[in-house]
Amino acid sequence: MEQEQGFIDYIEQSIIKNWDRNALTDYKGITLQYKDVARKIAKFHIVLESAGIRPGDKIAVCGRNSAHWAVAFLATITYGAVIVPILHEFKADNIHNIVNHSEAKLLFVGDRAWENLNEEAMPLLMGIVLLTDFTPVVCRNEQLMEAFEHRNVLYGTRFPKNFRPEHISYRKEESPEELAVINYTSGTTGYSKGVMFPYRSLWSNVAYCHEMLPVRPGDHIVSMLPLGHVFGMVYDFLYGFSAGAHLYFLTRMPSPKIIAQSFSEIRPRVISCVPLIVEKIIKKDILPRIDNKIGKLLLRMPIVNDKIKADMRKKAMEVFGSNFDEIIIGGAPFNAEVERFLKQIGFPYTIAYGMTECGPIICSSRWETLKLASCGKATTRMEVKIDSPDPQNVAGEIICKGANLMLGYYKNAEATSQIIDVNGWLHTGDLATMDTEGYVTVRGRSKNMLLTASGQNIYPEEIESKLNNMPYVSESLIVLQNDKLVALIYPDFDDAFAHGMEQSDIEKVMEDNRNELNLQLPAYCQITKVKIHFEEFEKTAKKSIKRFMYQEVKG
């Protein structure tokens, strides 16, 4: 598909065509129809215009997923301003820095995030507006204050017979290369960079979603991924909204219990999530329904009984609402044994590989054609290579170019030149192989690769994937200490204590796990020691562990 219309056309046409359909719902809260969204956008455009905010100015939004978060986003881009989504999980200092670095004129903020912020630390802002009810809590501009106070009067004067579809005429991007979004990375290295997305990237990513799995007007989609991250922004929001779907925002952490309850009520057609959520549901909700010991065995052994396969598939489908065509999993490595189990029972999942800098999609395939352990082929309008003399057998860095790519990092030409070379290839930092059909299999991140004194390259993710399936292991991290491999393990304390175990019992089980794991590993990557971690590892928005925080192991 070639780009025949602008991205804003996508949004405009969807609102007009689906005027009387439900658009955005906060789970157990408000519902906005497409016409309600259009009218709120119109009011915001009046406020922005009256306050002297111009196309190209930056507007930031920081808060949990909600219908009003989506309205703030849409009002910004349809006005021609640049939206700056900020993860609400960021520390206050980081949010202050992002607002200042992006030169945002306005900040839409959730009430919880606002509690921790200091307006004095963001001196460039004209105003700060609460997402809960769009009340301005800080106004440093008299025109902005007047516009907010009189927005209903101004709206009524401009549209005396109410706002109708024929009134919609949003500012269209002047070029596909025009800046639309600055998205600051969460990253595992501790430093946020502003990724600049042109409208070209938004269009290409959303168009690919529709090419792979067309969404129908009225289809239900549950938004679990943080909208402040580009994976959630594209898959859980723009993909569905541009097709007239009805989006539900959970507005809370997507625990297995909340997912089971909400999905049974909403019955979504498309589901996007990070691997951690699927892994927890399979291990804690699906397999134990049979028998805990048998369930764990099923992760490791082939399932030959068709009745067991059908039963397991039915149970897994029920947890996710039974109505979906496909679950799209991305954002972090997927546990190999959980994936093998899903493949065996014919569960409709697919892996999407990408990175923030590609907005985010690089590789993906429909579940019917996806190969085990692969993340699919290069998406349309993207070209992917493996920087290796033998890409089929020797892992090399994934490099890519195409329509999805960012413009660069905002106000950071040096960092841009380090990731995009002179020929336009983006260097992902991920290591992979590619088979003769073009299927890519990610082996690990080059920066995570551990190099031993003997010259062996070790990919910790592959070891962690095995360890995470062992008894009472919740999550793990493999690090190198004095040229020896050490496993940091956060046990599943709740499960262990529920079975009457004490600390000494947990330590013994972890040592048994180490011995069992080493039987499955070559001599050069044997684990010499286990260290128990008593808190969950700190993670990014994509639920990737922040490895840089745990490299110095003591004891």
Residues of each region from the PLM?
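Conserved pre-ATP/AMP-binding loop-to-beta segment of ANL
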Residues: 19-20, 148-184, 191, 214-220
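Gly/Ser/Thr-rich phosphate-binding loop
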Residues: 269-272, 282-370, 474
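Conserved AMP-binding A3 loop
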Residues: 33-35, 180-204
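Conserved C-terminal "lid"/linker of ANL adenylate-forming enzymes
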Residues: 450, 475-486, 514-555
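Conserved AMP-binding/adenylate-forming core of the ANL superfamily
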Residues: 3, 22-52, 57-66, 70, ...
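Conserved ATP-binding/catalytic segment of the ANL
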Residues: 385, 392-452
